[in-house]
């Protein structure tokens, strides 16, 4: 099999990278009706598998779970989760032949084995669904021509998909139809019904492509979403301890600082996050972020280049074939870092303290979000897609660190995201060490004193923050989500 993206000519590559259309609410007037009365079989009962299935069942669809014989015989976690929630469970051979839609929600590295097993069992004219297009785009999986291939990709962890649905809302979602597999022209109808069944249509749906979803998703998770948070955590902790800060306090400031800072990001973008600072601190955070962008731009560009070319995927798949040797080594090394093993701080840190003493962390967030967004857009990815894969998902990942530090983040994210995270963070930490050595008092761990500021400089910095393209598209998309939630609640 060959990387699908690399089989396309340049015009086709650019067309698929740039496919992104915000869909209107009226396009989902039929809800999930296209799939009602049809059999939907989900393969895999992890976080996405279980929670999407619960939402789809509550939306009136016929949902069952196909598991491997040994998972059923040994009553593994997937079997327990499905049966405890009242779902029908069976083997591939029992359920797949009757399925109208088979949804593959297993981890990326299992996709090829799963598809090779289920494809011969699928009836003529059935549909195959994914929530991430890696298997189609990067592995280059060939699917029978009578099978329709679609994607519904919620831009949140599975638990959030369920919780937002229960609130009467949903999470922003990308949908796509694989252009090589839409024999009956029904792919978009299937994808729309599936997205509606998960509640995604109530938060906003982007019509995208498998290519755009994969390339932007990989870039976001490797850089700002996971790699930058990991590198930033390790660098900031070590710097604080070197300066004499109590390791327990330093650990808490960082562990919960990311979540507190990015909560402002979620509500009002980079503008609101920066507005939480005093004027002198805002000017300093802006200056630090500009320095960071200059230093890190080549690293972000290298990751994007390796994602576009397929270099990243081929390297990771080689590690799959080598029993995840690199991944497991990096995971073990991360677990032994000083940040991960630091004692817990029992005292309280007030919300504003995280901002006042985390100026560098805010600068890292701003620089990372803007760089990821800019690099994706420069590579042909549309701004809305780049926003969802950078700023939008960052608070969700920061929340995992608040739960159990980097360990929890790396457990929750996919192995694909974890592998990319380590690639980035292992390069970023040494890259930023000279920068860290030049920090000034007040950049981290101590508040910057109030003082006079130059009005013209403050005016220009505020304008630069607010006029960045990610702030413009973010304001539009956040406004749309707020309006949609208001409509959903009123309904």
UniProtKB/Swiss-Prot annotation:
Signal peptide: none annotated. Keywords: Amino-acid biosynthesis, Branched-chain amino acid biosynthesis, Magnesium, Metal-binding, NADP, Oxidoreductase, Repeat. Mg(2+) 1 binds at residues 217, 221. Substrate binds at residue 414. It comes from the Bacteria. One of its GO terms (molecular function) is magnesium ion binding. The lineage of its organism: Bacteria, Pseudomonadati, Pseudomonadota, Gammaproteobacteria, Enterobacterales. Mg(2+) 2 binds at residues 217, 389, 393. It is an enzyme of class 1 (oxidoreductase). Residues 209-344, 345-484 form the KARI C-terminal knotted domain. NADP(+) binds at residues 45-48, 68, 76, 78, 108-110, 158. GO terms for cellular component: cytosol. This is Ketol-acid reductoisomerase (NADP(+)). It comes from Escherichia coli O7:K1 (strain IAI39 / ExPEC). Binds 2 magnesium ions per subunit. InterPro entries: 6-PGluconate_DH-like_C_sf, 6PGD_dom2, KARI, KARI_C, KARI_N, NAD(P)-bd_dom_sf. Involved in the biosynthesis of branched-chain amino acids (BCAA). Catalyzes an alkyl-migration followed by a ketol-acid reduction of (S)-2-acetolactate (S2AL) to yield (R)-2,3-dihydroxy-isovalerate. In the isomerase reaction, S2AL is rearranged via a Mg-dependent methyl migration to produce 3-hydroxy-3-methyl-2-ketobutyrate (HMKB). In the reductase reaction, this 2-ketoacid undergoes a metal-dependent reduction by NADPH to yield (R)-2,3-dihydroxy-isovalerate.
